[in-house]
Design a protein with these regions (language model features):
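Extreme N-terminal starter segment of soluble prokaryotic enzymes
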Residues: 1-6
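Structural alpha/beta surface segment adjacent to cysteine/selenocysteine redox centers
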Residues: 11, 18-103
Length: 103
């Protein structure tokens, strides 16, 4: 039985997008079985005291964009850093992903 690789991700997270672009190669190299684990950040932040992006200080928001640009360039993954409709309500999409995983 192959080892499992649990991938915890947020559907509308640019960080999850960057990570997802690396998963295929990682699974191919390791032979691991990929298990998708969607996470709803608002629930996680509420439980852990984290701040949603809109509630973070402007300096932290700016640094986040700077780091996303760096990682995007480093990984060679094109990314639109400030999309018009971000963040979007992902609850329906998460439910769909969970239903697909359980099917």
């Amino acid at each position: 039985m192959p080892q499992a690789l649990d991938y915890y991700f947020v559907l509308n997270s640019p960080w999850s997008y960057l990570a997802a672009r690396q998963l295929g190669g990682l699974v191919d190299r390791t032979g691991a079985a990929l298990r998708l684990r969607p996470v709803q950040l608002p629930k996680l932040f509420a439980a852990t005291g984290g701040l949603q992006l809109r509630d973070r200080p402007p300096a932290r928001q700016a640094y986040r964009l700077q780091e996303l640009a760096r990682w995007s360039q480093h990984l060679g993954v094109p990314m639109h850093l400030q999309p018009t409709h971000f963040p979007a309500d992902e609850r329906l999409a998460v439910g769909t992903v969970l239903a697909a995983i359980e099917a």
